[in-house]
Regions:
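Bacterial N-terminal signal peptides that target proteins for export
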Residues: 1-16
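C-terminal motif of bacterial Sec signal peptides marking the signal peptidase cleavage site
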Residues: 20-25
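Bacterial signal peptide processing site
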Residues: 27-30
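Short, glycine-/small- and polar/acidic-enriched structural segments
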Residues: 35-183, 192, 208, 227-230, ...
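Solvent-exposed, polar/charged alpha-helical surfaces in well-ordered, non-transmembrane soluble domains
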Residues: 66, 70, 74-75, 94-97, ...
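Pocket-lining segment of extracytoplasmic ligand-binding domains
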Residues: 111-113, 190-191, 196-282
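Secondary-structure end/capping motifs
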Residues: 252-323
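Conserved C-terminal helix/tail region of periplasmic/extracytoplasmic solute-binding proteins
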Residues: 318-335
Length: 335
């Protein structure tokens, strides 16, 4: 797969923006150049035991993080001795300063692309604790209003598409699908609009199309938009989308808690896959979805574990798309 020089430049600039967020977060800390802030007491609990550890997860209110909500509902974290609470965030990278300063310990539903690029820029030592979701054909795509005249992927050439973050999994997979369909991505313009604001922007004509995940894709379709293309097809079929991220410092200082969180979350994912009705029950509790919408929304796949192979697949696509990715991802996954 090849991408145009203009698109590579655009993605590279987006990567610099992520790095700027990270540099600002680090420089605003009282710590020196020793690295991200993460005190030994952050999150509570002794380093050798998980019992009594409090973990705050800055989590996106999307279907990606259903496994987290299921794990809380089914008591998997409590069984592991963890006290897990969730704070909703609109963008995963916006939660990075809180992560580095220790007010949250984990980012939930963070797209792999942004955090792999952060690691590659050596401004943030990333530790992936567990996977959140892999995309399926029906739960992630590009939508447009009927009046736009956009009905197929080829119609997106020269258009403006809203994404939650310009340097993330959305731009990468959308470009991959468009390229596979013979569309030049050089003229495609991406603008950052938080997921909750995408439908309003689309209806107001501020963008030609949106690249959205659930429940926001279903909200757009309910508002009259039409699905143009899934972004989980072709080169992006069953693509690993997002995961749960912490700092390597926190994971090293709290190894028992980190491992307990990983295992409880993986139980939550497995339970979510086996009991979709439970997922549909929890969705209205942390997303904007109604119970009626949750009953029919397409669900993704919640992987039981994050593998070097799946993370390497992302890194490979990143490099072919003009983004910077670590050459070795094996050390970034909590064993």
């Amino acid at each position: 797969m090849t991408f145009t020089r203009a698109r590579r430049a655009s993605l590279a600039a987006a990567g610099v923006a992520v790095a700027a967020i990270l540099v600002a977060a680090c420089s605003s800390s009282s710590s020196s150049s020793a690295g991200p802030v993460s005190s030994a007491s952050a999150g509570g609990g002794a380093s050798g035991t998980a019992a009594g550890t409090s973990i705050v997860v800055g989590s996106l209110p999307v279907l990606d993080t259903a496994g987290l909500q299921v794990a809380i509902k089914e008591g998997f974290f409590k069984q592991a001795g963890l006290n897990v609470t969730v704070e909703s965030v609109a963008q995963s990278t916006a939660a990075i300063p809180d992560l580095l300063h220790g007010s949250i310990q984990v980012i939930g539903g963070g797209n792999y692309v942004s955090f792999l690029e952060a690691q590659a820029h050596a401004t943030f030592s990333v530790e992936f604790l567990a996977p959140a979701v892999d995309c399926t054909t029906n739960d992630y795509g590009v939508a447009a209003m009927p009046s736009s005249g956009i009905t197929t992927a080829s119609d997106l050439a020269g258009k403006t598409i809203a994404v939650n973050l310009t340097q993330n999994i959305q731009t990468l997979t959308t470009n991959a699908v468009l390229t596979a369909d013979g569309v030049s991505t050089a003229a495609v313009k991406y603008v950052e609009i938080p997921f909750p604001d995408m439908v309003a922007a689309l209806k107001a004509g501020r963008v030609n199309a949106i690249s959205a995940v659930e429940p926001f894709l279903s909200a757009a379709l309910a508002a009259g938009a039409k699905l143009v293309t899934s972004t989980c097809t072709g080169p992006a079929a069953n693509f690993p989308m997002s995961g749960y991220i912490t700092t390597q410092t926190w994971a090293q200082q709290h190894p028992a808690a980190a491992k307990a969180f990983q295992q409880a979350l993986e139980k939550g994912n497995a339970y979510a896959n086996a009991h979709p009705s439970v997922v549909r029950t929890v969705l209205p509790t942390y997303t904007s979805m109604t119970s009626a919408a949750a009953a029919t929304v397409p669900l993704g796949t919640y992987p039981s574990s994050l593998t070097v192979t799946s993370l390497g697949t992302i890194a490979t696509l990143m490099k072919s798309g003009g983004l910077t990715a670590p050459s070795d991802v094996s050390s970034l996954i909590l064993p």
